[in-house]
Amino acid sequence: MGIAGTFLFMIVIGAAIGAVTNHLAIQMLFRPYRPYYLFGKRVPFTPGLIPKRRDELAKQMGLMVTNHLLTPEGIKKRLLSDTVKNQALLFAEQFTQKMAASEMTVHEALAAAGILNPQEKTDAWIDRFTDEKLSELYRKYEHRAIKDWLPDELQEKLDEKVPLAADYILKRSTDYFESEEGKDRLGNMIDDFLNSRGMLGSMVQMFLGNSSLADRVLPELLKFLRNEETKKLLADLLSQEWGKLKSYTLYEADEKWNAKDLLFSMKKRALAALQTAPFFECRLGDIISRYEGEITGTYAPKLLDAALGSIAAHLEDVLKRLRLEEVVKEQVDQFPVERLEEMVLSISKREFKMITYLGGLLGGIIGAIQALFVILF
């Protein structure tokens, strides 16, 4: 073989060895996928580097994600950024507009959300809630005087109403006894009174007559009812009774007048008057559109700020509880090596080819140097 042939042969051999070596090294990153054994001993370099170090790689990737990529500070910064807020507000605005155009009733909307029998549940909740609150208030104030827990302003207004109540009672009484019904009632009362007196009553009836006595009593009765002293007397009596009532505890009031039963009876009447059915039959769009401006302009931004602030405040604790490093490790462990190889090669295919060609180039240069030494020496 001539000098040129030797020179060319060694360059080709060196280039082939360099290219094959680099290509083999790239393949050995992933392959073989499992270890091979010969005569009971594991063949060296099996499995490939990545399959062999898979557990360590998964652990390190988990730590890298939690310590350097998905850090609490980075997520907080993203959450509180104007971009996220604007996107969230845009979504809220679009959702509100969609709901404002909805033809569904409130009942249908709740049913679509999986909430069945909302009216019955609401009525039951209101009844239960008011019972609990009334019982709680009764236990809290049952041994305290009424005047101690009534607001001062309310007490002052009630105190001012006592004389007016006296005037109202006397006026209504006067109007009643001036009416035909009142006159008849007064006559019957006088008749019953005289009958209860036996012979004396019979004698009075015989001499005066029932109608004559009623006609004589009525003007005096009306005169008494219109008298200022009567009004003052009644106002004083009502004030005294009101003062006594204010000094009662709820327990004492309950003992005397069944105040607790009266309270719960009033509650039942109030709830019976509270009709929830019309609300659930309303069109959802009518309710939303009525407050659309306030929802998108006021409530949504405030709720968003509060929600993002709360999430940011508890984010570090949430991430610790999630243990993202374990999640990443589990996902990497479950990820097929074949798919990982395909993904890496598809991304770096050109670079790996260049590495192979570089190996061939370096091998060819080394072969040329070796040929030069062989020829010269």
From Swiss-Prot:
The chain crosses the membrane at residues 1-21, 357-377. It is a multi-pass membrane protein. This is UPF0754 membrane protein RBAM_010020. It comes from the Bacteria. Belongs to the UPF0754 family. It is found in: Cell membrane. Its main location: membrane. Keywords: Cell membrane, Membrane, Transmembrane, Transmembrane helix. GO terms for cellular component: plasma membrane.
